[in-house]
Regions:
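Helical "substrate-binding/catalytic lid" subdomain
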Residues: 164-280
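Hydrophobic beta-strand scaffold residues
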Residues: 27, 47, 113-114, 155, ...
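NAD(P)+-binding Rossmann beta1-loop-alpha1 motif at the extreme N-terminus of oxidoreductases
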Residues: 1-63, 122
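Amphipathic alpha-helical hairpins
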Residues: 15, 53, 60, 66, ...
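Rossmann-fold dinucleotide-binding core
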Residues: 94-177
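Rossmann-fold NAD(P) dinucleotide-binding segment
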Residues: 51-112
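Anion (oxyanion) recognition and catalysis
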Residues: 21, 41, 107, 149, ...
Length: 282
């Protein structure tokens, strides 16, 4: 039975702890807001007063914290109490730059560290499903593969480049935000046209554009802008979208229209829609 410390028991961290307790791990928890940690006592968790108290004697330490600054603060607080051989696994959605800067400091202090952000909701964490991205030393990954696999549906090892998982996590989250913004703009058009939002969404029961991330994205990454949907024609459709909203506030489409105009002005009008990436893909 593993002895685990878990620092940061908010929505996601608390759900991860629930899953660990169900699997039989001994878990000591700490949270800046103590009440969130205390809520896990009834399930069998032990609550520590400080990060150092939490990690003392633990075989592995998991973290799900708000941001890079707090990660650095908490790691500095518990490092003197960390058991020899303990492995620190950070599930925080942290910046690639912050993670890259953090790793040499941890190495110098003798801390064994993996960065392992996740794509999962709290309920997915309870049910041990979802996707976990892992970056860090191969030997540490191999040692932790079994317990990490128990936490999620799939573990994707991205190699020893320590900030790669952080980068991939924000790439993925960016698409979540784009989808939410795009749906908002669909609702704006629907409102302008007098169509209920729930009705507007039914188009996506038949037309499912998610596959274009791979299909068009591959071409864009290679700077292959041979047209299957000419940018100047896409810009015409964009005009129809903006007009349909009849002045309703929109989140993302006006910015895309601006990027289209800039690309057309640079001579990409007869290229593919993906040519809006020409300025950033070299």
């Amino acid at each position: 039975m593993a002895s685990v410390a878990f620092l940061g028991t908010g929505l996601l961290g608390g759900a991860m702890v629930e899953g660990m307790l169900r699997r039989g791990d001994q878990v000591t928890v700490w949270n800046r807001t103590e009440a969130k940690a205390r809520a896990l006592e009834a399930l069998g968790a032990k609550v520590a007063a400080t990060p150092g108290d939490a990690v003392a004697g633990a075989d592995r330490v998991h973290m799900t914290l708000p941001d890079d600054a707090i990660v650095d603060q908490i790691v500095a607080a518990f490092t003197p109490r960390l058991a020899a051989g303990a492995i620190v696994i950070d599930h925080t959605t942290a910046s690639p730059q912050g993670t890259k800067a953090r790793i040499p400091r941890l190495n110098a202090a003798g801390v064994k560290f993996l960065h392992a952000p996740v794509f999962m909701s709290p309920q997915m964490a309870r049910d041990s499903i979802g996707l976990m991205l892992v970056s860090g030393p191969q030997a540490l990954y191999d040692a932790m593969l079994a317990p990490l696999s128990a936490m999620t549906g799939e573990v994707w090892y991205l190699g020893e480049e320590g900030d790669r998982a952080a980068a991939y996590k924000i790439f993925g989250n960016s698409m979540l935000f784009v989808i939410a913004a795009g749906v908002t703009d669909v609702f704006a058009m629907a409102k302008g046209l007098g169509i209920p939002a729930t009705d507007a969404l039914t188009v996506f029961s038949k037309f499912q554009p998610g596959g274009l991330i791979k299909a068009r994205g591959d071409k864009m990454a290679r700077r292959d802008f041979s047209a299957t949907f000419e940018l100047k024609m896409a810009r015409k459709d964009m005009r129809l979208m903006l007009e349909a909203a009849t002045g309703q506030p929109m989140v993302v489409l006006p910015g895309i229209a601006k990027a289209m105009d800039e690309a057309i002005a640079k001579g990409h009008g007869q290229d593919d829609l993906g040519a809006i990436a020409a300025a950033v893909v070299k």
